[in-house]
Amino acid sequence: MSGLKRLISGITACSLLFSVTGTGVLQYDTSYAAEAKYNYAEALQKSLYFYEAQQAGPLPEWNRVSWRGDSTMSDDVTGGWYDAGDHVKFNLPMAYSASMLAWGLYQYSDGIKSAGQYDIYRNNLEFVLDYLVECDRGSEVVYQIGDGEQDHKWWGPVELVELEMGKRPSYTCDASCVTAEMSAALAAGAAALKDSDKASEYKKCAEHYFDIAWKTKSDDSYSKAKGFYDSWSGFWDELFWASNWLYIATGDKDYLKKAKECIPNLGKEDQSDELKYSWGMCWDDVMQGAMLLYAINTGDKEYKEHVAKHLDYWSKTEGVNGKCVQRAPGGLAWLDSWGSLRYATTAGFLAAVASDTIFSGDKAKVKQYKEFYETQINYALGDNPDKRSYVVGFGNNPPEHPHHRTSHGAWDDMKNDGVKDHRHVLY
């Protein structure tokens, strides 16, 4: 696989849930610029920078965001990432993002190293995994810190949140969706960082969280995130996802047996008994990524065919049985109006991994999937009808007003200062 392909895949892994963002004068490898339409190393660098803008608690020395400071220091668990442009710490989407960052490093470490981003990538991954470990409460986990309703009533930088609201509440549960997602993130991290001193700790905690999730097999206690990050897909997809990553991290075949037990309970196509293949992978529904891992882990023909069906639905104009994902002008694979680039770039990442693993010997599929993932990431970087970048701070005419309280920098809940333009660039 070419270095350029590895690098594009690494970018895709970083841009799944949050905006692709950052700021400052930073160093990145420019050697790919000559062979690529865009500077993918810069895009990767700015993708990673966003996670540093999201850091909660005491900031590490390596944090490069000059306009950020320590924040929410009285949280019951400090650290982790704030959600999107807000200040709540929701562990379901946070752990999903961590698991995908880990997969990117696990699968494409050479490309990340070639871009000059390996050390900072690793730092960002360990930062969030350390937080997930600290959320352990024995038979439960801390799954959320902050109240979404209260958070949305105030607009200002996160460094001032405690002055406005005081100590924030934390919430615990044993719900399978979030404990399994946290398990998957830690197991994927252990696999990606297998030479790290922290790998054994991540693996041990991943197994512990999985035991909670498997024993509970319910989302009843997952309540405070409703209305913000509901578990619409249920919990079987997260159990399937976590069991596959635990098999990779531990080599214990019992996790493959558990993965197989999950399959009959996974989502189906509407009015059908066929396993769902048309929906995209996201923070709520990790079935398609888990199915790809299962096909890699087992080599089972049936599940390789499922992966092909999913990717054909997304990447071929004729789709599957005459049906395919919608195409926006310019070639974007359009699934939903909320976070359309998120779905498209994630599908592109799965296409890249599949072409490098279970379909590496199929030249036609490798060509098809390569064209697909390049089209999707390049659309985000500027190959679209508006000829603009959708990455803040990157390329031509990027967005200038992202929904982000801290980068906006209003000082008094927009009562008097009336800041029109963002005080800080959220690359």
Provide a role label for each language-model segment.
Residues 20-35:
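Sec-dependent signal peptide cleavage junction
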Residues 106-123, 127, 166-170, 188-204:
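Short coil/linker segments at helix-helix boundaries
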Residues 1-11:
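Bacterial N-terminal signal peptides that target proteins for export
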Residues 124-138:
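Carboxylate/His-rich catalytic cores and anion/metal-binding grooves
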Residues 37-38, 84, 110-122, 196-200, ...:
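Short, surface-exposed loop/turn segments at secondary-structure junctions
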Residues 34-104, 144-192, 236-261, 285-319, ...:
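Aromatic (Trp/Tyr) and acidic
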Residues 12-20:
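Hydrophobic core
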Residues 264-269:
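Solenoid-like repeat scaffolds
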